[in-house]
Amino acid sequence: MSSAPKLFRVIGGAQNYDWGKLGSTSAVARFAKLNDPENVSIEEEKPYAELWMGTHPSVPTVSAQDRTPLRDLVRAAPEEMLGQDIIDKFGSKEGIPFLFKVLSIRKVLSIQAHPDKALARQLHASDPKHYPDDNHKPEMAVAITDFEAFCGFKPLAEIDALLQKIPEFRELVGDDVVAEFHSGIDSSDVAGKKKLLQKVFSRVMNSPESKFEPLAARLVERTKSDPQLFGETLADLIQRLDAQFPNDIGLFCGCLLLNHCILKSGEAMFLEAKDPHAYISGDIMECMAASDNVIRAGFTPKFKDVEVLVDCLTYSFNPVEEQKLKPAPFPRGTGVAELKLYDPPIDEFSVLQTTFTSAGAEKFEGLDGPSLLIVTEGKGKIKLQGSDEALDASTGNIFFVAPKAAIELVSESKDTFTSYRAFCEA
């Protein structure tokens, strides 16, 4: 007899980092309140940054019925909650291999990258205080409102144009490296071009405050006196981020070196290990491998590991459109809903968006691993196929779905009913 339920509601944990949206402007706060109204009261002056769903011990997700941590339920019945194939593949009976989050961003997050598995093992062994585990941390973001981020380095010709026309950028990098970069970027030697980009980034990141702070102040002034030099979008971006982090190195290493990526609701981007990125504003669903390893560079008062960062990045340089992850169809559901699968090229997770705009049902085959589903808009029902017991599924509600459990989502009106389901399969 199976003891663990195959479908049940859970409650995630909210994080109040300073960069979060304030009070009820935050999707995190609204979802947390709607899912647990008796225990959550929104403080309007307080930032609500992240809502965590998973088995990470830092911020427990608990059963809505009796507040038992999901991690404890998994550890008590790993074969039923994870599936033997997932246990074998990831080598753990302790938890779900991914962490699913809602993020509501008011202020820019630190420019950062995450190590791959080999580097994570090395960093964790040498500096466990700053690198708490030995796992990699690929991430995917799906916008649920208009969202902007830095992601990956700009194409080299764009960086070269900025170095040529913005005196403060040129002075920070140095005429010698600027000239070498300018003459080398048309080469067919990709590895050589990556080395040149690394030189530029290293000069920026290793410049002392006494050098970059006055240059940053001049840079901001130039965006006001000569905005057409930058273009309206970039000038505005530099001014907005300077207001949040005055004279920060991120104005150079973020605004002038990284792609400014703007996503509409439903658009996604995948961030591979060792790619620099930073979220700027908006609300997203984020899914990642279950790790806490971060190598930071700018827009942060926290520990910056410049040497590791400069050494580890891939230095890929691609147009901003190539940073986006296009959704694919999902053939394992039948019914009236629109299904979009966000399936990055890694093992730990995929995310399925299900949207109803009419009354009706969508039936899903059982998946070969655990999943977590959150309703982000509207309301409907969720149930196991063949069961008479349907659970209310409304905005903010989160559900755990066990491996092989075939579920059904039901919309009872023409109002939009949207959910996101993160899952992992062997």
Curated annotation (Swiss-Prot):
<feature type="binding site">
    <location>
        <position position="114"/>
    </location>
    <ligand>
        <name>Zn(2+)</name>
    </ligand>
</feature>
<keyword id="KW-0479">Metal-binding</keyword>
<comment type="function">
    <text>Involved in the synthesis of the GDP-mannose and dolichol-phosphate-mannose required for a number of critical mannosyl transfer reactions.</text>
</comment>
<dbReference type="GO" id="GO:0008270">
    <property type="term" value="F:zinc ion binding"/>
</dbReference>
<dbReference type="Pfam" id="PF20511">
    <property type="entry name" value="PMI_typeI_cat"/>
</dbReference>
<dbReference type="GO" id="GO:0006486">
    <property type="term" value="P:protein glycosylation"/>
</dbReference>
<comment type="similarity">
    <text>Belongs to the mannose-6-phosphate isomerase type 1 family.</text>
</comment>
<feature type="active site">
    <location>
        <position position="296"/>
    </location>
</feature>
<dbReference type="InterPro" id="IPR014710">
    <property type="entry name" value="RmlC-like_jellyroll"/>
</dbReference>
<dbReference type="InterPro" id="IPR046457">
    <property type="entry name" value="PMI_typeI_cat"/>
</dbReference>
<protein>
    <recommendedName>
        <fullName>Mannose-6-phosphate isomerase</fullName>
        <ecNumber>5.3.1.8</ecNumber>
    </recommendedName>
</protein>
<dbReference type="InterPro" id="IPR011051">
    <property type="entry name" value="RmlC_Cupin_sf"/>
</dbReference>
<feature type="binding site">
    <location>
        <position position="277"/>
    </location>
    <ligand>
        <name>Zn(2+)</name>
    </ligand>
</feature>
<dbReference type="InterPro" id="IPR046458">
    <property type="entry name" value="PMI_typeI_hel"/>
</dbReference>
<keyword id="KW-0413">Isomerase</keyword>
<keyword id="KW-0862">Zinc</keyword>
<dbReference type="GO" id="GO:0005829">
    <property type="term" value="C:cytosol"/>
</dbReference>
<feature type="binding site">
    <location>
        <position position="112"/>
    </location>
    <ligand>
        <name>Zn(2+)</name>
    </ligand>
</feature>
<feature type="binding site">
    <location>
        <position position="139"/>
    </location>
    <ligand>
        <name>Zn(2+)</name>
    </ligand>
</feature>
<dbReference type="InterPro" id="IPR018050">
    <property type="entry name" value="Pmannose_isomerase-type1_CS"/>
</dbReference>
<dbReference type="GO" id="GO:0009298">
    <property type="term" value="P:GDP-mannose biosynthetic process"/>
</dbReference>
<dbReference type="GO" id="GO:0005975">
    <property type="term" value="P:carbohydrate metabolic process"/>
</dbReference>
<dbReference type="InterPro" id="IPR001250">
    <property type="entry name" value="Man6P_Isoase-1"/>
</dbReference>
<comment type="pathway">
    <text>Nucleotide-sugar biosynthesis; GDP-alpha-D-mannose biosynthesis; alpha-D-mannose 1-phosphate from D-fructose 6-phosphate: step 1/2.</text>
</comment>
<dbReference type="Pfam" id="PF01238">
    <property type="entry name" value="PMI_typeI_C"/>
</dbReference>
<dbReference type="InterPro" id="IPR016305">
    <property type="entry name" value="Mannose-6-P_Isomerase"/>
</dbReference>
<dbReference type="Pfam" id="PF20512">
    <property type="entry name" value="PMI_typeI_hel"/>
</dbReference>
<dbReference type="GO" id="GO:0000032">
    <property type="term" value="P:cell wall mannoprotein biosynthetic process"/>
</dbReference>
<dbReference type="InterPro" id="IPR046456">
    <property type="entry name" value="PMI_typeI_C"/>
</dbReference>
<dbReference type="GO" id="GO:0004476">
    <property type="term" value="F:mannose-6-phosphate isomerase activity"/>
</dbReference>
<keyword id="KW-0963">Cytoplasm</keyword>
